[in-house]
Amino acid sequence: IAREREVQRLLFDAGLAGVCVPRAYGGQGLTPAHQRVLDEELEGYESALRIQSPTMTPCLAVLLDYGTEEQKQRHIPAILRGEELWLQFLSEPTSGSDLASARTTAVRDGDEWVLNGSKIWTTGAWFSDWGLCLARTNWDVPKHRGLTVFMLPVDLPGMELRRIEMLNGNREFCEEFFTDVRVPDADRIGDVDQGWTVCTRWMFHERMLHNSPYVTWPVGMRAAGGGTPPFEIARAAGRLDDDEGRDLVGESRMLELVAAELKDRVAAGV
C-alpha cells in the first residue's frame, strides 16, 4: 500500500493524475479521451490500481457530483496525491443487495450526527483513511426517502474495524461497527434524506467504471459534463468500438430505466 501511495504521488507530480478532474481541485481539466490515451500508454507499467479502485471509483466521482466546494477543496487534491484513500460503507449484514434497507442509523444532535450500526464486505477498509457511509436518517418515510450519505475518517472514536478472512486466506474484506460515532454535519454529502439520489449516482459511477483497466480513466466523467449521457461519454472516450464500452452503455441505460420505474413506484407508495 505504501508503494502504491508513492506511485500515485509520482503520477500526480508528473501531471498524470486526475486528468479529467477540474484544475481547481488539482486535476488537469481535460477530457475522457485524453485519459483514454494515457491509459493505453500506461499499459505494462506499474500502477496504483489497488488503491485507486475503491478511492476513485466511485468516491472521488461522488465528491465531484455532490460535495460542497469546501469538501472538494479539502479532499480531492489529497486523493489525487495518494494522501487519502477512500472506501464505501454500503453493505450491511441484514440487507443483502438491497442497499435501501440500510439499518445503520444517523441521529442528529445539534451540528453533529450520531451513527450506530454495522457495515460489511467493505473492500480495503484496513488501509483506507476516509469512507462514504449510507445511513438511515428517517424511519417515517418510504425506505428510499429516509437515507443520507456522510463522509467520515475510519479512525473516529466508536468505530471498530475487523478484517474478514475468506476460505482462500484472502483478507481484503472488512466489517465495521459504529457505536455512537459522531460526524459533523459539515461532512454530510448531499441533502438530508436524499441519500438515495446520491447513492444512485454513486452506483452509476461504480458500475460504469468497475471493469476499466485503469480506474483513473473515468474518474472525471462528472467534470467532463455532469449530466452527460453515457453514450456521449463513451463516444468521447473512443469506447463505442469495443464490446465492453457498448455493454456498459447499454447496462447504464437499462439501470436508468429501472431507476425511473422504481422512482415512480416509490412516489406512489407502492
Where do the language-model regions lie?
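A short core secondary-structure module
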Residues: 116-162
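Internal helix-loop-helix
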Residues: 8, 12-83, 123-130, 256, ...
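A short, Trp-centered hydrophobic/proline-enriched beta-strand micro-motif
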Residues: 82-90, 134
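Short Ser/Thr-interspersed hydrophobic loop/turn segments at strand-loop and sheet-helix junctions
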Residues: 15, 38-43, 135, 151-157, ...
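A structural signal for short hydrophobic beta-strand segments in well-ordered beta-sheet cores
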Residues: 104-107
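Short glycine/proline-enriched turns and hinge-like loops at secondary-structure junctions
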Residues: 30-32, 98-100, 124-129, 143-146, ...
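Glycine-rich beta->alpha junctions and the first turn(s) of the following alpha-helix
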Residues: 159-261
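Glycine-rich phosphate/pyrophosphate-binding beta-alpha loops
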Residues: 95-96, 120-126, 167-168
